[in-house]
């Protein structure tokens, strides 16, 4: 492939990603969500000046931290927290993350200290681990080969463009959900657990994971459409892009498990409300991924 960049190529478009951040307040517990959208702009000249044309035939190189996070998707999330202190009898009096429906029912019935956040986290863990095999498949970059019709580059670009639009729509819907009075209201007063509503907490946790299911379906669509061999790198780069929300969910759920563990360590020895660090749900696209995806759009829509 020639590395020459024509005037027409310089005037072509590159896709970008718009990041929408919603903060998680330490008391309101609003997860921070990054949505994604598509930006069209004439920025190919800068890309062409810094990248060789041959790079389009190689998948975007995953940074070590992003790869490690994606590797974690191949395994179930272990809710057992890393302990600050050796466990003792007092620790057992504080809520733990429930990994089975029976444990969840017991948690709701007994309502030990920190039960609202343990209940919320338990639903997330059970729903997430219930789709572990599917997450493992998308993290592996599984691309089935078929004997039927296959998408060419232009056809797959249209599908990818639609998928990015769907990601953006999901982000907007999730934005509204996270900011709704019902989300915060389910947990009641920050310093009065008796005002929390167990059914409401289960409902919002399940709805949060319904969005996770939607992101997962989009990742499967992006990765598993049959394409011609010259489009496989485009699929790989779009697959990395589609993993960003799923990686963000995994990290958020793991952090929530850690916060429950910190409550187990601290609550038995505190006479007042314990304030823990924020937990955030971030879906940032790693550096360079935006340019790689945009270059593939340019390549096939030129």
What function would you assign to each model-found segment?
Residues 46-171, 175:
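N-terminal topogenic membrane-targeting module
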Residues 166, 170-293:
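Soluble C-terminal extramembrane regulatory/interaction domains of multi-pass membrane proteins
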Residues 5-7, 23, 56:
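Terminal single-pass membrane anchor helices
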């Amino acid at each position: 492939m020639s590395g020459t960049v024509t005037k027409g190529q310089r005037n072509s478009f590159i896709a970008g990603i718009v990041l929408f951040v919603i903060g998680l307040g330490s008391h309101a517990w609003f997860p921070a969500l990054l949505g994604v959208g598509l930006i069209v702009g004439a920025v190919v000249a800068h890309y062409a000046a810094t990248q060789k044309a041959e790079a389009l035939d190689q998948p975007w190189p995953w940074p070590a931290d992003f790869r490690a996070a994606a590797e974690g998707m191949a395994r179930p999330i272990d809710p057992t927290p890393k302990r600050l202190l050796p466990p003792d009898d007092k620790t057992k009096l504080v809520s733990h993350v429930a990994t089975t429906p029976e444990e969840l029912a017991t948690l709701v019935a007994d309502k030990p200290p920190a039960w609202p956040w343990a209940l919320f986290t338990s639903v997330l863990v059970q729903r997430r681990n219930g789709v572990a095999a599917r997450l493992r498949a998308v993290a592996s970059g599984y691309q089935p080969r078929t004997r039927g019709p296959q998408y060419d580059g232009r056809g797959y670009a249209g599908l990818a463009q639609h998928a990015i639009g769907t990601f953006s729509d999901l982000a907007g819907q999730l934005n509204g959900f996270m900011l709704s009075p019902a989300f915060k209201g389910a947990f009641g007063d920050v310093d009065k657990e008796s005002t929390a509503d167990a059914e409401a907490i289960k409902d919002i946790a399940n709805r949060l994971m319904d969005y996770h299911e939607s992101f997962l379906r989009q990742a499967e669509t992006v990765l598993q459409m049959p394409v011609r061999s010259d489009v496989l790198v485009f699929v790989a780069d779009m697959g990395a892009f589609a993993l960003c929300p799923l990686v963000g969910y995994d990290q958020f759920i793991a952090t929530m498990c850690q916060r429950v563990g910190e409550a187990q360590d601290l609550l038995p020895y505190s006479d007042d409300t314990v304030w823990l660090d924020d937990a955030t749900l971030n879906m940032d696209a790693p550096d360079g991924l935006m340019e790689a995806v945009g270059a593939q759009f340019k390549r096939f829509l030129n």
